[in-house]
Amino acid sequence: MVVSVKVFKKATPNGKVTFYLGRRDFIDHLDYCDPVDGVIVVEPEYLKNRKVFGQLATTYRYGREEDEVMGVKFSKELILSRDEIVPMTNPNMEMTPMQEKLVRKLGSNAHPFTFHFPPNSPSSVTLQQEGDDNGKPLGVEYTIRAFVGDSEDDRQHKRSMVSLVIKKLQYAPLNRGQRLPSSLVSKGFTFSNGKISLEVTLDREIYYHGEKTAATVQVSNNSKKSVKSIKCFIVQHTEITMVNAQFSKHVAQLETKEGCPITPGANLTKTFYLIPLAANNKDRHGIALDGHLKDEDVNLASSTMVQEGKNTGDACGIVISYSVRIKLNCGTLGGEMQTDVPFKLLQPAPGTIEKKRSNAMKKMKSIEQHRNVKGYYQDDDDNIVFEDFAKMRMNNVNMAD
């Protein structure tokens, strides 16, 4: 069986400069981050003694584009890294195996490049827009771009500039640990003796995207009130650090009266299962995603991870966390009682069985979707599959990027 390697490509409008990237997702391992490595091909007669410059940039949009009036901007663009790609400033640069293969295949006009994310740079996050909002979405987005000019300060012309969006993501640690998060609360009532105790325990601390969360609920009713119903939620908590804004959204929920009412002196132990999925929140404004909802492989935004010894308060960009929330309805006069149990929602780490299964499913979908798509072709000599860099759609492929 021959294993092909997919390579993404994108050219300038005039077709004179072409980007080649071996991947679109780059992983933050907390102690280091994958470098952005690729190859750029430029026609030498087009340069005419000019140079090709590259940039790694991030755009942090924290307000709606339509609200930008009187010169007020609700976005920041930062150039994280820049370099002169052609001619190379470091001819002894160590190339990755993918770069070596591409340079060998594409010839003398191919030039490798490498950019690095700075420490503590935020992960890619997109906040889902409202249906009638056609502006740029809120969130953190990374772009790799190249342009032709005499110097880095030259005005960038669209016809000779190529840019493509990449993602910076985080993976779960290889070991998910043995800790079982739990919470215990109790509630008393005015003019009534006794309390209702609620204990919630999760079966693990780290869940992968698409996995069931199992919450075991134990209710002990030592009061004179009755529990009428139980509500379960998975809550996504979002913090936009630039404007110090925080909000929460339910990404999965259920309500049940099974085992209810829980009368005075009675107990109940029951396990509830919920699956938080981006596909079930297509029309929910403000839901945080790790890409755009129209992408075929989009997930809910992963929990923000920080290095050991630091807390999420030190993180920048958009900070994401999750919790399971259980609410008990204690009647009209008794009100509600609730508790939250935090957990982490992450991508499975490379090398794990879950990651291999996920990659296999994505590969099957990709082969099926792109089998007859123009711009997707294979070079049998080096087992390289070239694909025009474009957004992958859920139901079709739009190659007009």
From Swiss-Prot:
Tissues where the protein occurs: Inner and outer segments, and the inner plexiform regions of the retina.
Domain of life where this protein originates: Eukaryota
GO molecular function, one term: G protein-coupled receptor binding
Protein's name according to its UniProt entry: Phosrestin-1
Listed GO CC annotations: cytoplasm
Cited SUPFAM superfamilies: E set domains
Transmembrane segments: none
One Pfam family linked to the record: Arrestin_C
Protein task: Undergoes light-induced phosphorylation, probably plays an important role in the photoreceptor transduction.
The keyword Hydrolase belongs to this UniProt entry's keyword annotation: no
Protein family membership: Belongs to the arrestin family.
Keyword Phosphoprotein belongs to the record: yes
Encoding gene (name): Arr2
Keyword terms, alphabetized: Phosphoprotein, Sensory transduction, Vision
GO biological process, one term: G protein-coupled receptor internalization
